[in-house]
Structure formats: C-alpha cells, structure tokens
Amino acid sequence: VVEQRAAYALVFGNDIGDLREILRAAALLKSSDRGIRDVVSGYGELWSAQLLCAQLAAQIGPQRVRWPDARTVMVVEEHELGPVVTWAASEQALQQHLVEDPADVVVITGYIASDRNGVQTTLGRNGSDYSASIFGALLEATEITIWTDVDGVMSADPRRVPDAAVIHSLSYNEAMELAYFGAKVIHPQTMAPAIAKQVPIVIRNTFDPAQPGSRIAAVAEPDGQVKGITSIDGIALINLEGAGMIGVPGTADRLFHALHEAGISVVLISQASSEHSICVEVPEAAADRAHAVVGRAFDVELRDGQIQNVEVTRSASFLAVVGDGMAGTPGVAAKVFGALGESSVNIRAIA
C-alpha cells in the first residue's frame, strides 16, 4: 500500500508540474486552443481512474487490477457533429492491451481519447458516460451501468410533477425520445454505441445504490401506454405560410438549408397537409437569426406575395409524451389534448 501511494503521489506530482507549464504557456500567449483545453480538462479523469485503480489494488491485490490509459486504446475522428469512434482501430488496440496485460478488474479512463495521429482529444459534453457506452460496446458487455445522482429516468420532471416516479424499464427508443426532448439523465449520443451492440444500459444512483434504477434495453417490460412526459422551455415557432407554396417542390429543403447554414437546430417540424404552411420550432435564443435567414431565403417570394408571412411566436414550450405502447392505441391523443384544454393550454403545432 505504501509503495502504491508513493507511486501515485509521484505521478500526481509530475502531472501537476506539467499542468503548471501548460497553463503558464497559455497565460504568456494569452490564448488557449482546443488542444490545450483537451489536455488540461483530461487530467481529472486520469487522476481519478489511477486513484481508483490504486485503491482497488490495495484491496484485492495489484496483480488483479489494471489501468489502461484510454488515450492508447480509443481512437476518434472529429466530424461535424462531434467526435466519432474509429471502431476497428479502437477494438484492435483494446484487445491487444487486454491480451498483453490481463486482469480481473480493468479501470479505464473516461472522457479522453486520441486522434489518428496520437494527439489527445476529448469526447466533449457527457464524454464520460459516452466512454462507458463505447467500451461496453467494444467489449460486448452484458450490461453497462451509468452511475448518476438520481434514482433513474423519471416519468416526468419531479420539480414540476411531485408524484413523478422512476421508470424501471424502457426501450432504447423510449429513452432516446425522453433524452432528446429534455430528460437530462442520459444523453442520446451516449446510447448509440450500446444500441449498436444491443447492450442494456442501467441508470443507478451513486448516493443510493440500493435503488434498482432504470434499465434501458431493446425491448422494455410492458408497463402501460405512456412511459414518460418531458418538455423543453424557451422555444420559438417559425411559421412560413403562403398559397404560393402549394405544390411547389423544394420549399422545405430551402427552409432547412437556410437554418442549417446559420447553425440553427430544429426541434420540431410540422407541415399542413395542404402544403400551405410549414412550422418549425427552434431555440428561442436563435429566433431572431432564424427569422432573418428564412426571410432572406424567401425574399423574392415574400416580395411577390407568393409567401404571405414569416411569423415568429416566442415563449413557447415543447411537450413530448413518450411510450412505445401508444402505437395503435386509440384515445391517447384525446387524453393529452383534453388535459391541455382543461388547463387552458393552447396547442400551436403537433408532430
């Protein structure tokens, strides 16, 4: 134990020295590029993984525990939507490490990786959970457990719905929908590697490990029609309407291209069956930019009267009702709309 403590202290001390030099260089240059930020932000994961490895080694023996540095086994490439794993190279590197240095318990660093040139990078927001899913997929694990500060995926936001309960079983589709539309427990990107290999994900509470948590798998246990309700506030509706749109191909393509070029994310799309209007929901912070770029994209049609208006409705909220059991079940929409109507909530768009 004394030797392990001394070894960790030496590594920690050397890293602190390197960190000082990196920060001193950034201060002198008065700038820090992406590479510097990746290196600095990765130290926490390196230290915590090595510390856990040392603690486990002290308990069960150093020969049974290994710490592979994720920078040597996970290879990623930067794409427009974020880092993408180079699966073949990562799998080969990981298997080689496990063969050359086998152990009963492997503690792998989360959040950090390397590009094809061996330069350190990070997986960005929710990178640690994403790492767990990636390694679970690479190892074809029987299960991936994500430890958080809540009991699992909730049926609604408990701050708004006091009797919200933990959803003990969800399908991948249900979890993806809830995550995309506001549930903060797990990021949609985190689930992608696990889904590809059909590895179940379990969400557990670090502070209450006795709780069973939420299990996310290809098929969920039957548990009613609606699994959860979630929402996003701070939404703006951009409505493009005009008789000149009817039967004209390419209108939607031009609309989405204009928003894409401006870097504006679309939350929801709704189009009238008559093709007289298209409504999209965007973050309210981007409402002015969205209004401007859509106006420029259809400037000719607006001046000619083919399109009557580009209307912006602010301070809207998006409400999603999620559940695989709703498919083919009559009356669900009627209950939702009835409840909203009783509460005097106006519905502006449906998808």
For the regions a protein language model found, what residue spans apply to each?
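Conserved beta-strand segments of alpha/beta enzyme cores
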Residues: 64-66, 200, 346
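A conserved regulatory-domain signal marking ACT and ACT-like small-molecule sensing domains
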Residues: 213-351
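Non-catalytic alpha-helical coupling and interface elements of nucleotide-dependent molecular machines
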Residues: 5, 24, 199-202, 295, ...
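Short hydrophobic alpha-helical runs that function as membrane-insertion/retention elements
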Residues: 143-147, 201-203, 267-268, 349
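Active-site C-terminal subdomain of aminotransferase-like
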Residues: 197-211, 233-234
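Nucleotide/pyrophosphate-binding catalytic subdomain
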Residues: 1-191, 281
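Conserved dinucleotide-binding and phosphotransfer motif residues
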Residues: 59-60, 197, 262, 343
